[in-house]
Design a protein with these regions (language model features):
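Peripheral, non-AAA+ core regions of ATP-driven protein-machinery
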Residues: 1-5, 11-63, 67-291
Length: 291
């Protein structure tokens, strides 16, 4: 019998009897992976190799394992939610800038065709410190909620924390906000969180992060039907990002009525009907528009 798909779970427990080393060793992992790869190429069988991860979230064992295979996928997500993200770290035959969103249901994993709607579920009404971002995950625009909490510090050095957003980038953006938007954050702790387990790694998420911080700092609410898109520079300018028309179409499709974007957008914009677009030049102007 020739199967269409072969799943090896896990590569660290497989062993070759001709190899005297213990299962999980470097030589065993290499030998077993090579055997599976030869079987896949010669018989035309799709092989999935499941591997353990270490405490840092990387694949455990020798790096040669990642070099031997055609595609490396990470299955990740918040253990407190039922949603899981499938990310590609390596793809020999396509782009790695794509994600798959799934939900763990009673019948197993099911696809989430509209991840933006999922990530915006349960948004608080009338709460300061929250702003909606629109980022590109590969070729797909995704909307996500960014939350911030700014509170008076009790420490000599104010605390900074970020979940779902690069920590160093968050610290940089708060420094820009303090310098260019007159926000005295040096006596406040600041915490940033991206809802739904999504990680925002692209420049278009800069502006919504700063607006969420400003909203919590001023204790003023950002309109629930507003989305912010833009990169923040060190001088406080709001810079353009790519795929603006796709982002605006997704914003409109999900029922949002307002969108703050950079004034100097390089694309010829096609603004959807019913969507009000506010073009801003710098951070101070963006904060005043949003609040």
């Amino acid at each position: 019998m020739k199967p269409d798909i072969l799943i090896a779970d896990s590569i660290q427990t497989l062993y070759n009897e001709l190899n005297e080393s213990s299962p999980g060793s470097i030589s065993q992992v290499k030998d077993c992976t090579m055997t599976l790869m030869q079987l896949s190429k010669s018989q035309g069988i799709t092989v999935f190799v499941v591997g353990h991860i270490n405490k840092d979230g990387n694949i455990a064992g020798p790096k040669v394992l990642e070099h031997m295979v055609d595609c490396v996928l990470y299955f990740e997500g918040d253990p407190n939610t039922s949603y899981r993200l499938l990310r590609a770290a390596k793809n020999r035959f396509g782009s790695t800038n794509e994600i798959g969103v799934f939900e763990m249901a009673d019948c197993g994993l099911i696809e989430v065709p509209n991840p933006s709607q999922m990530l915006l579920e349960g948004r608080p009404e009338g709460a300061p410190g929250t702003c909606v971002a629109c980022v590109m995950e590969g070729t797909r625009p995704v909307l996500a909620e960014v939350q911030a909490l700014v509170t008076k510090t009790t420490f000599n050095v104010p605390r900074r924390a970020a979940d779902g957003f690069d920590f160093n980038r968050a610290v940089l953006l708060m420094a820009v906000a303090e310098k260019r938007a007159n926000m005295k954050l040096n006596v406040f702790d600041a915490y940033i969180n991206v809802i739904g387990g999504l990680r925002l790694d692209e420049p278009g998420a800069d502006l919504p992060v700063v607006l969420a911080v400003a909203s919590s700092y001023r204790d003023q609410v950002i309109a629930e039907d507003l989305v912010a898109i833009g990169e923040v520079g060190l001088t406080g300018e709001i810079r353009s990002v790519s795929n603006m028309n796709q982002r605006l179409a997704e914003v409109s499709r999900l029922g949002f009525k307002k969108c703050i974007i950079p004034r100097n957008s390089s694309e010829k914009l096609e603004i959807p009907a019913g969507l009000s677009v506010y073009r801003v030049k710098n951070l101070r102007e963006a904060i005043e528009t949003a609040l």
